[in-house]
Curated annotation (Swiss-Prot):
Gene3D superfamilies, per database record: 3.30.1440.10
PROSITE patterns: RIBOSOMAL_L5
Pfam families according to UniProt: Ribosomal_L5, Ribosomal_L5_C
Gene name as annotated: rpl5
Stated role: Binds 5S rRNA, forms part of the central protuberance of the 50S subunit.
Upper lineage: Eukaryota, Viridiplantae, Streptophyta, Chlorokybophyceae, Chlorokybales
Cellular component terms (Gene Ontology): chloroplast; ribonucleoprotein complex; ribosome
Entry GO MF terms: rRNA binding; structural constituent of ribosome
The protein's name in its UniProt record: Large ribosomal subunit protein uL5c
Major localisation: plastid
Length: 185
C-alpha cells in the first residue's frame, strides 16, 4: 500500500516541480530523502527514568525505536562526562517517513494553539527544512496523563533539493502549512 503523502508526491508534486524548474531528467526532481527527529535531554545524565520515558514517547510518535546520543566530551559546568546520554535521535526513511510527515502536517501542527503556519525561514541553504516543536502533546498518540514532563524536539526534513526555493515548493505541494511565501534572505 502506497502512503497517502507519497501518492501526492508522485501525482502532484513531482510533475509540478518538473514543470516549474524545467528538469530534463526524472532523477533531477527533488524528493524527501529522510526525516531526523532529535530530542535533547539535559536532565538525562542525572535521571535515567526521564531518558526511558522520552525514548518511549518518541518511539510512539515516530513508529520506530530511537538511538541514544551521547556526549562527545566532558563539560564540567554542565556536570557532564564523556559518553553520558544527552538525547535521542530517530531517522525515518521510506514509508515510515511519509507516514510521520503526513501525521505531522495534518494532525499535529493544526493542534498547536494559535497556529498560523510554520516559518519559511527554516531552510538551510541546500533545500533542507528544520522545524522545532515545543511540546510532544500535539501528537494524538501521546496521552496527556501518562507523560512526566513536557519535552520539545527538532525535526529535520532532508531533501535532494539544490536550492531553498525547490525545497519550499516541494514541501508546500505536499501540504506543509507555511506562514508566508518563500523569499530569499
Amino acid at each position: 500500500m502506497v502512503q497517502r503523502l507519497k501518492a501526492i508526491y508522485l501525482e502532484k508534486a513531482a510533475p509540478r516541480l518538473r514543470e516549474m524548474f524545467e528538469y530534463k531528467n526524472v532523477h533531477q526532481i527533488p524528493r524527501i530523502e529522510k526525516i531526523i527527529i532529535n530530542c535533547g535531554l539535559g536532565e538525562a545524565s542525572q535521571n535515567a527514568k526521564s531518558l526511558d520515558s522520552a525514548m518511549k514517547e518518541l518511539s510512539i510518535i515516530a513508529g520506530q525505536k530511537g538511538v541514544i546520543t551521547r556526549a562527545k566530551k566532558a563539560i564540567a559546568n554542565f556536570k557532564l562526562r564523556k559518553d553520558m546520554p544527552v538525547g535521542i535521535s530517530i531517522t525515518l526513511r521510506g514509508n515510515s517517513m511519509y507516514a510521520f510527515l503526513d501525521r505531522l502536517i495534518n494532525l499535529a501542527l493544526p493542534r498547536i494553539k494559535d497556529f498560523q503556519g510554520v516559518s519559511s525561514k527554516g531552510f538551510d541553504g541546500h533545500g533542507n527544512y528544520n522545524l522545532g516543536l515545543k511540546e510532544q502533546l500535539m501528537f494524538p498518540e501521546i496521552n496527556f496523563d501518562q507523560i512526566d514532563q513536557i519535552r520539545g524536539m527538532d525535526i529535520s526534513i532532508v531533501t535532494t533539493c539544490n536550492t531553498d526555493s525547490e525545497g519550499f515548493y516541494l514541501l508546500e505541494t505536499l501540504g506543509m502549512p507555511f506562514k508566508e511565501k518563500f523569499t530569499k534572505n
